[in-house]
Amino acid sequence: MLQLAAHFDVFMGLTMNLVAEPMSAQPVVDRASFYISVSDRSKVSPVIYHYIVDHAQGHTPATIRDQVGETFTQALEAIRGTPPDTIGPGFFGPMRLDEFVATRLVETRVHGMDLTDALGMPPLPMPRTTTMAAEVLDEVLARRAVPGRPADLEGDDLAFIRAAAGRGEHPDPRLPVVG
């Protein structure tokens, strides 16, 4: 659980880097290409995993909870106080803030489900976040394969997010699109 909480802290903390280092460059990464870039888990995941393990070290459940709360508060303040068209470092290249925020919403929805699943709870109700996450993953699917959700996932954003993010088996060979 500490590592999952540390992941929340790290993924939201990246927002402050983008806001703190505005660039006068053209964005080269958008919300969908961000996830296409991380889709090869064999290259990206080990680096992120080790960073998160290190980030979790020394924390207790209480200290990581406080840290994550502080990071989310700071990130939300930074987002609200920065024009959405601000361009800054977005992990894989320059990104607009609004495009980067969309990726943070996907992370929040997917890893929020990881957390509630681990606790045996239903997913937290986050309708706007769920809609945005599903839209981003729909776009990733459209760019990586044949567009369009499998028929059984039409109209069920949570089930689609779960399948598209590899949080459950689905017979469609196009899924998952991210890990």
Language-model region placement:
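Structured surface interface patches that mediate subunit assembly and partner/cofactor docking
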Residues: 17-32, 56-61, 66, 76-179
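Solvent-exposed alpha-helix faces
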Residues: 9-10, 73, 113
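Conserved alpha-helical segments that form or flank metal/cofactor-binding pockets of metalloenzymes
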Residues: 2-49
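A short, structured beta-strand-centered segment in the mid-to-C-terminal lobe
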Residues: 37, 44, 48-67
